[in-house]
């Protein structure tokens, strides 16, 4: 990952094409389904770990910042629930899920932009993949359940 140009047709191919696609998106992107790197098969398996590259090429910097802001909102909701939770389990669970989402997002974005090696970390709730998506949805459901149980006990005691 430090020098993908050394093996541009082998191990560095995916990362080089990812950087080209991210850079070609510019500020506003090329438009929905108009990405040349993505749809001319220069970037293989774009729907999996490199979905952020596809978003960057088609929707540009504005689209990528919108996705990042949505993730920050979701992570901040997890931390807000941990602060408001009455039970220690709900607090620990919410902090853990929020931290896990934060690490996944940072690692995926760093991976597709060349700051970290490509290791196969999906972008939560966006990348194609069954087991990772299922695990993330279940963990968010547990956080929402912890928040709901805290509110139900408040209503019951009132």
How should each PLM-predicted stretch be described?
Residues 72-83, 143-150:
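Structural signal for the C-terminal ends of transmembrane alpha-helices
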Residues 29, 62-69, 101-110:
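Hydrophobic alpha-helical segments of membrane proteins
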Residues 81-120:
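Loop-to-helix entry and N-terminal half of a specific, functionally important transmembrane alpha helix
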Residues 1-64, 86-90:
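Hydrophobic, glycine- and aromatic-enriched re-entrant/interface helices and adjoining loop segments
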Residues 58-78, 93-94, 134:
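Hydrophobic alpha-helical transmembrane segments
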Residues 54-57, 97-101, 129-132:
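Transmembrane helix-bundle signature of multi-pass membrane transporters/permeases
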């Amino acid at each position: 990952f430090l020098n993908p140009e050394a093996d541009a047709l082998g191990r560095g191919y995916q990362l080089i094409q990812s950087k080209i696609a991210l850079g070609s998106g510019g500020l506003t992107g090329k438009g929905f389904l108009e990405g040349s790197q993505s749809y001319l098969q220069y970037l293989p398996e774009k729907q999996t770990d490199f979905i952020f590259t596809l978003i960057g090429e088609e929707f540009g910097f504005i689209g990528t910042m919108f996705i990042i802001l949505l993730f920050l909102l979701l992570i901040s909701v997890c931390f807000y629930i941990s602060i408001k939770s009455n039970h220690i389990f709900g607090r620990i669970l919410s902090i853990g899920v929020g931290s896990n989402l934060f690490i996944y997002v940072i690692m995926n974005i760093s991976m597709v932009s060349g700051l970290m090696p490509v290791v196969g970390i999906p972008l939560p709730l966006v990348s194609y993949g069954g087991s990772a998506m299922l695990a993330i949805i279940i963990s968010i459901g547990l956080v929402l359940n912890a928040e709901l149980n805290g509110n139900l006990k408040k209503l019951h005691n009132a």
